[in-house]
Structure formats: C-alpha cells, structure tokens
Amino acid sequence: MCSIGEDDFGDEGATHAMLPGSSTVGTVITAGSCNKCGLNSLELYKLNFRAAECHQCFLSYARHKFRAALGAAKALPRNAEVLLLVDGSAESLVLLDMLHFAQTQNTFKRLHCSARVLHIDAQSSPSENDPLPMLNELRERYAPFEFYVIQLGAEVHSLKLLKDYSASRLDSTDNKLRSLTARQDYVRQQRKRLIGAVALQLQCTHVFEPSISSSLAAQLLTSVALGRGGSVALDVALLDDRLQGAVTLLRPLKDLNEQEVQFYIKAQQLKPFRSDESSLLSDASLQNLTSAFVANLQLNYASTVSTVFRTGDKIAAKRQPIEEGPSTCALCQSDLDSGLSDTLLAIEYSRAVSEMGVALQQQNNMEALEQRARERLNSMDNLCHACRNIHAELTHGSLI
C-alpha cells in the first residue's frame, strides 16, 4: 500500500512527487574535443545520457538510427519504390536529408531504392504562409528527387509536379463535422487514404512517414481514447500495411526523439516551415490535449514518454481470422470491430437512452430500447467503431 498520506502534501507542495528529469533541450557546446573521435571541434553536441560529440559523429549516430530501423526488420527490399512525405515539419526535413544522404553514398553504403517526395497541401485559407517557395528550395537542394504536390481532399488524378502546381479552393468535408476532435480524426484518415492512392498512382510500394517517438507516444494515447484500440499497434509500429493496394507505410524515425531532431536541424541548417497542428494546441480537442500532455511529459520526464512509446511495441495488432475473410473499415482500412460485443452494445444503449428521452419514460419498454441499441450497432457495418463516431458528428453529407 502507498505510505504517502494527505499530510505529506503541505505548504511545500508534493514533497514526494516525481521530480523532473533531464530536459529535451540538450546542450550545444561552443568548442572542445569530441569524446568519440578525439578531434577538436568548434561545436559539440551534448545529448542527454551521451558524451559530447562533434558535428560529424553526431550525424553518424543519428543516421545510424535511421538505417538500423530499416535494416533490423528488413522492411525495405532492394530497389524499392519509395514515396517520402514532407509536410514542412522538422522531422520530415530530417527524414528527407537522411534519405538523400543514404542515396548519395558509395555502392557499399548506399540505400538501394528510388524515392519521390510528396507534399499534401492542407491550407484552409489563402492567408496562410505559402509553402511552395520553401518546397522549391528543397527541390533544388535535394536533386534529383522528384517533388509532387496534391491538395488534401482532391482526387488523385489532380496530382502535379511541384513546378506545375497551383492551389485551388476545394469543398472540405471536415467543415461539416461538429467537433474539432472528429474533424482532426477525419482529416488524419482522409490523409492516409490519399497517401495510399498517390502511392499507387506513382507505382510506389513503400511510404516513409516522418513520425518520431514523442509523436507516436501521443498517437498511441489518442488512438486508445478515440476507440481505435484494436488498431493502435499499427498506428505506432515501424510497419503499417493498411494502405490500399498492398502499399506499406514505414516509420524509420520512430527511435529518434525531439532533442535529436532539433540537433540534426541545427547541424544541417534545415528550415522547417510547417505551422499547422502545433499552432492549434490552444483549441480544445482530444488530439491537441493529448499532444500537449505528452509534450509536457517530454520536457519534464523524458523517460516516461519513452515508456509510453515502447508500450506500443508490445501490443499485437488485432487481425480477422483468415477463414472469415478480409473485413476492413471503409474509411480507415483497419479491421472491423463492429461485431456485437457487450462494450459496444453498452455504448449504443446509453446513446439510445439519450435519444429517446421522455418517450422512454412514457413507453417504459426496455425491449424496444435494447432493440434500438442493437440496430444502431448494426447500422453502418462498413465502418469501425471510431469511424462511426466521426459519422455521428457529421451534420450533412457523407464521409466517403
């Protein structure tokens, strides 16, 4: 039993509470000797729990994590066609730089694959910063990669090369959803569907997603809270095979943390230009609050975030038995969880009570109430539980 009582929390605050550990900021030392190669350097990078390293030793360490993630699981076959997602975030630029470096090495060390770069334009208003100038700078720096752009919500045939792209106004379904939580979840699923369609269009067999440990920890908690527990393992795993057309999504930066990403940005003088989700953290949604919670943990208790993230590696993905045949959600492509279960029935029962209200008291018919709950559970049987929750927030129109 816990021996800490209320008296232990006096005017001095939580005396026995967990104390903040190492921050994620790290230290850049102006000059000194590298603890790994022994050479003098004008700038040393001091990561938490690692000795100070010179510019080249740090880059070798970070790039090894990228190569090790792909090599340990043998997830990327030789001469694979890869679609790399660049959204302007720091981690996406790090992944782009690492992949370009791996492709420009000698034959022995070269990563043997062909890469194309995709940017999904999700600007909701013309007043937002135009990403095209920054993308053109990246195209020149990382030649000969081909850069493609497509608008979120557009048809796949509207995919354009960066040099030929011009934005147009589209009618967005997410504006028809009542809550910000539902809108953000829908945009995430819509984005995944579009990525899979573009990969098929460009004949790419693999997609590189720039997710790091802290973002995957936030995604794990968010998926559980949204009712996606059956597919949470694939949401944070190195390999996700739910995209259409047997396209495989890979997360080769999953072992990098925020501190390593920021040091890499500084070392390579990269310029992130994304300001979308991170700027919305003041708006209340389940995703934003979870991200803020994990960011605070990462700042004060970095090892706790690692524990949350590593939990995802121990969760097995829920799969349909082979004899039952494939049965996936029409929106998120996860295995359907809409079978009759006590938990889902209880949720729909509660909703039915709220809907019937006074009529329930007048009729006093519990059988009708349970029948109503079963009908709700069996309706939209092509959607999983979480995607049905999105549909419930839809004011008009259709999700798909």
Swiss-Prot record:
UniProt KW keywords: Cytoplasm, tRNA processing
Gene3D superfamilies from the UniProt entry: HUPs
GO molecular function, a single term: nucleotidyltransferase activity
GO biological process: protein urmylation; tRNA thio-modification; tRNA wobble position uridine thiolation; tRNA wobble uridine modification
Transferase recorded as keyword: no
Signal sequence segment: none
Pathway connected to this protein: tRNA modification; 5-methoxycarbonylmethyl-2-thiouridine-tRNA biosynthesis
Keyword tRNA processing: yes
Transmembrane annotation, as ranges: none
Domain of life: Eukaryota
Cellular localization per UniProt: Cytoplasm
GO cellular component terms, semicolon-separated: cytosol
Pfam annotation, one family: CTU2
The family this protein is said to belong to: Belongs to the CTU2/NCS2 family.
Function: Plays a central role in 2-thiolation of mcm(5)S(2)U at tRNA wobble positions of tRNA(Lys), tRNA(Glu) and tRNA(Gln). May act by forming a heterodimer with NCS6/CTU1 that ligates sulfur from thiocarboxylated URM1 onto the uridine of tRNAs at wobble position.
Name this protein carries in UniProt: Cytoplasmic tRNA 2-thiolation protein 2
Native organism: Drosophila virilis
